[in-house]
Amino acid sequence: MEFENNIPIYIQVINQIKKDIITGKLPMGAKLPSTRELAVLYHINPNTAGRVYKEMELQNMCYTKRGLGTFVTEDAAVFKALRESMAQEFISNFI
């Protein structure tokens, strides 16, 4: 993934994961990579990967089960809100 200089890396990674959730590549309830795996996958610092999951949890996009990992939210309302916000973002970028 190529990162843009004017947007923080953690936000760009969150946006990519949002796209994966919306398109079904990451279905609701799917297990996300560990923090270290995410860091390797995106070639980012493990602290940045940790921040990605922390911010996603604050936005209710995912949840963590101690000892089991981090999972995509199963809340349909959150999923719908993600789709709507991504659609709005796409429309505003297009116009």
Predicted region positions:
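Short glycine- and Lys/Arg-enriched binding-loop motifs that mark or flank ligand-binding interfaces
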Residues: 20, 25, 46, 63-65
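Extreme N-terminal segment that seeds HTH/winged-HTH DNA-binding domains in transcriptional regulators
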Residues: 1-31, 37, 41, 81-95
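A generic structural signal for solvent-exposed, polar alpha-helical segments
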Residues: 9, 16, 48-51, 59, ...
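HTH-adjacent hinge/linker in prokaryotic transcriptional regulators
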Residues: 58-95
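N-terminal helix-turn-helix
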Residues: 31-63
